[in-house]
């Protein structure tokens, strides 16, 4: 809470910012009765920080329905018609944490609000105010407050219900026209999603409830659990009738569709070379993609919020904890053509030394994107060389592209509230001795404005793959593979990042200019006084940061893939199959854009303080979700109707850059001060029995499986649910029973 007074000495808190905590915890400045007190500051101590995943559902409850139909019909000896139809429906339900106010969107509490502890000394009609706390010299008329980052725990967790319906139809003809094979068809698919979230909070209705002058007003000062665990639940909730006055449901509807028509033709014997028949394939394709995203009226700007206490404070969203998002839709038409040729240059019958077989593949594809008026053409070349039987080498070179998606092109502007460090303000505080360093800069809510553009061009890429395959004749059934790959991506579509934009604003202000993408209010007299003598021009608070989608920088990644596949010859003890795969990420380097290079140069030259770090650039190997090693392997044994399988999966260690040592180490390793996230190894075990006889049970299989056999937890990380969900699984030991019958 923030008391709207100019003199901090009017209360025992001696600060305009305070938060509530149990009186049994140290740091109390002012008694708030009923076992709670006020402590100065705006960042709660560790003991009272709320467990934001309390009561949440980690894994959604899901119900799925599927239906499919296939039909083939021979029109003639050479032509067949086909049809495929499918329908899919899913119903998901989960609980999310209770709603909270965004850090950049505080709510004003009137001095006349019934539960305001710093309200007037008397209520309407001259009745003494029972809720005004003693021991202050706040004027008898009371003081307004601002409520920041408040979580409505007494409203309960949010229920999220997501229903998805998808269907797909395919129809076409295939066959041959003379020596040519052809396939032509039409595909249409559509998916619609309804997302309903209950137990949300309307800012407008909330403020009306808080600022009532009667006891049925919402009371945000009653504390959570003063005698129990203050980090979860609410032991002193407001009455349900009060909460119901501002409780709302929020909905979102979205959908995508794809219409595609194509014609493909191929022939595997266009003409003959000494190495064999030359094959060719080609085709043309048209596709139309659409999407729509229909947000709730309280999110899309139809119903907005204007603070009735704090002048000039508005928000495009009336939903607590959610930034405004406009309704968005888009359409894209794409025309494409491709051609491919297979050229066998050498075969074994030619008896060429050290060349048992040599094959070449050449391909190309061209696409035109109508909505962004961009045309791309990409080639591909691949070769396979068998040195001697059982020893082969392979390689491929290709160019690729990825068009910006429809959201990146059609987004008219989405705002997001993020907690960011205002390095400019904090640098002035460091210069004045108010902060020890920029590392102590307290985060504040910052509005980031993200928008799309039709001027975005497709991303380009270049890939190289080189590999070898070994199938030694003296070990029948064994195959070993090793492949090196390298991918270079150019003009990646993304955002610069509001935190990087603020850091760039500091760098330029140190040189006498500014970053125009960081829009600030005019400095107040207090801010002008703060900047005096610091060498920086006075700066006001950040209004918003412009962070549009751009074609930014390049990325180069490379690594190795290894494989082992072994079907053990039958030696009388059943059939064994072994499989092992390993992926070694060698490097993942993200280059900087022009603005990024300016930041990196400023850090290297010492113009930016060492406390300013630039994320997402440079060598990102083992950073966040990019482990060096991923491995998986399995052993299967089969004898008659019985099969037993053992599967293992390994995911390597990574660094969590959101956790930094309190005392920094001096090290040549740039990641030494980050938190090291452990690796994980999971084991699955399965048993199956298949009935093979002449009865009605023939073809029936009963399978029993245990996933995560040893009930391993994911390694700890500073993430939403305490682990990297894109790398590790939180599912404990899971038992599966499956009964399948083939007809």
For every predicted segment, state its role:
Residues 4, 9-12, 16-62, 68, ...:
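Surface-exposed, low-complexity loop segments enriched in small/polar and acidic residues
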Residues 61-65, 163-167, 257-259, 331-337, ...:
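Residues that define the transmembrane beta-barrel architecture of outer-membrane proteins
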Residues 69-73, 171-175, 261-267, 337-343, ...:
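Residues on the lipid-exposed face of transmembrane beta-strands in outer-membrane beta-barrel proteins
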Residues 76-79, 176-182, 270-278, 346-358, ...:
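Short loop/turn motifs that connect adjacent beta-strands in outer-membrane beta-barrel proteins
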Residues 81-83, 182-184, 278-282, 337, ...:
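Transmembrane beta-strands of outer-membrane beta-barrel proteins
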Residues 87-91, 177-179, 186-194, 269, ...:
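Transmembrane beta-strands of outer-membrane beta-barrel pores
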Residues 204, 479, 488-491, 586-587, ...:
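C-terminal beta-signal and adjacent terminal beta-strands/loops
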Residues 416, 574, 578, 582-695:
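C-terminal beta-barrel architecture of Gram-negative outer-membrane proteins
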